[in-house]
């Protein structure tokens, strides 16, 4: 199922300035619940929800998505799916680093309908890859929620959008798997006059990480 929009429950600025954010982001689950309770006071919209709720999570570190998913489950008829884990780290926080990040997931995802949960939506590649993982295991992802986001909440691209991107960059499939690209990634790509400029910027970013 194609998801056009991500739903945002609060905002990034408020989240990162919470007194609970640092410890929650570093892996303290109690702090993560305190953060969620501070930022989201009404879960009534989820009352009739009956599906799996799967957070973006690693085996250590940031517990905010897990806490948000847990609160949604507590206030609905949904079931928490906490058996899927992100296995690799993003190479950096710059947009260029996010462009070439390929998230890898592992774990058990029961067959059924899902909503996905993350703390912040930036490019959407982490959520997109989680969606792909769940769907490859027979699940059906119907929606996604985050606390905060970047400028856009648009998520998956239309066939027309992908066709226009390929017309702009005929060799783009040498660099990216088009169906995996999100709207935010596509809009970033369209800023470049050529793919070689994009690749050069990425190479420079990786060089700086290695030597500075």
Regions found by a protein language model. Give the residues of each.
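Active-site-facing substrate-recognition patch
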Residues: 1-48, 89-108, 183-191, 200
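PRPP-dependent phosphoribosyltransferase catalytic core
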Residues: 5-8, 131-212
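Short glycine-rich phosphate-binding loop at a beta-alpha junction
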Residues: 46-60
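Short coil/turn segments at beta-strand junctions that form active-site/ligand-binding loops
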Residues: 47-50, 111-113, 140
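Short, highly selective alpha-helical patches that border small-molecule cofactor pockets
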Residues: 61, 65-73, 127
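Structural alpha-beta junctions
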Residues: 73-82, 135-142
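A short, structured active-site edge motif that brings together acidic residues
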Residues: 80-91
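A contiguous pocket-lining binding segment that forms or flanks enzyme active sites
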Residues: 112-136
């Amino acid at each position: 199922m194609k998801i056009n929009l991500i739903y945002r429950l609060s905002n990034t600025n408020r989240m990162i300035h919470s007194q609970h954010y640092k410890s929650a982001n570093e892996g303290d689950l109690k702090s993560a619940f305190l953060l969620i309770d501070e930022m989201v006071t009404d879960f009534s919209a989820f009352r009739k929800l009956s599906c799996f709720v799967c957070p973006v999570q690693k085996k250590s570190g940031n517990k905010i998505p897990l806490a948000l998913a847990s609160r949604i489950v507590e206030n609905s008829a949904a079931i928490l799916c906490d058996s899927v884990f992100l296995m690799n780290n993003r190479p950096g926080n710059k947009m260029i680093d996010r462009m070439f990040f390929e998230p890898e997931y592992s774990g058990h995802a029961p067959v059924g309908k899902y909503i996905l949960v993350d703390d912040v939506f930036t490019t959407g590649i982490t959520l997109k890859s989680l969606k792909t993982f769940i769907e490859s295991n027979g699940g059906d992802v119907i929606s996604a929620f985050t606390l905060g986001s970047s400028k856009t909440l648009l998520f998956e691209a239309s066939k027309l959008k992908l066709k226009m991107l390929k017309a702009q960059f005929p060799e783009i499939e040498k660099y990216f798997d088009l169906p995996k690209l999100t709207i935010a990634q596509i809009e970033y790509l369209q800023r470049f006059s050529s793919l070689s400029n994009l690749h050069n910027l990425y190479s420079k970013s990786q060089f700086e990480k290695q030597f500075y």
